[in-house]
Amino acid sequence: MLETRSGYKSGFISIIGRPNVGKSTFLNRVIGQKIAIMSDKPQTTRNKVQGVLTTTDSQMIFIDTPGIHKPKHKLGDFMLKVAKNTLREVDVIMFMVNAEQKLGKGDEFILEMLAGNSTPVFLVINKIDQIHPDELLGIIESYKERYEFAEIIPISALQGNNVESLLDTLPKYLPEGPQYYPADQVTDHPERFIIYELIREKVLHLTREEIPHSIAVVIDKIRRDEENNDKIHVAATIMVERDSQKGIVIGKRGALLKEVGTRARKDIEMLLGSKVYLELWVKVQKDWRNKSTHLRDFGFRDDEY
């Protein structure tokens, strides 16, 4: 049974927002370790990612959700469902927006979704390092007119500006509760999931156009070498929807796939603390984003959310 220390705060914080506002960058900065995929391409977070930050007097469990948008296929339906489900039974909702972008239809969509909600909502204005300070007041006013936020906090997740102030404020809205996770645990996701995300991140960085949204990764094997315990063999398959996409991911004479492997291997070695032999394959699974069976096979399961 978990013990609750008097005055100790703990709770769950959902991070929501339009695609590409910096939610994963924020989470990785706060946790101090890469656990959420980062890319300049929208819709890169597909599953909710839980990051755990433990201090002497609080434990904050962050849930990074897919960027909220109106879905165009079954995968989009899944991503929106994950985002909505994280709003249930959390203690605080962080609505993150991009200071460089005006309040748009995507933000209105989220504000409508929050209507009638009783959970405290923080408006977190990210990327303030990219605008002139004089612009900030106008941004704040445009959102204040549409929703009664518990707190409005401008930050730069990339540079770290004002992030500590946000982290100091959040526990004030959390209930007293137990320490759910050990102090040194930063995520509840298994290594297999993080390896999957690291490989997909490298593909996103190195490809273009429709390729990113058509990609899934299946981890086929993670096995420690029996003769050399410091070496781990990882085998994974990159799934695409069309033969033309397969050619792009492989690249001329296999150059792009090799670069994906090199970059992913370095991050996986840092994660596991061991030498890694990474074996990558590319396979076509036509129209997988619109087939529920393929979504489940590739790790997108409704019952886990």
Swiss-Prot record:
Q: Which domain of life is it from?
A: Bacteria
Q: Which residues form the Era-type G domain?
A: 9-176
**KH type-2 domain: from which residue to which, for each copy?**
207-286
Region G3: which residues?
A: 64-67
* Region G2: start-end pairs: 43-47
MF terms in GO: GTP binding; GTPase activity; ribosomal small subunit binding; small ribosomal subunit rRNA binding
The answer, when asked if Repeat is one of the entry's keywords, is: no
- Which NCBIfam families does the entry mention? era (TIGR00436), PRK00089.1 (NF000908), small_GTP (TIGR00231)
List the protein's name.
GTPase Era
Species annotation: Lysinibacillus sphaericus (strain C3-41)
Name the gene that codes for it.
Answer: era
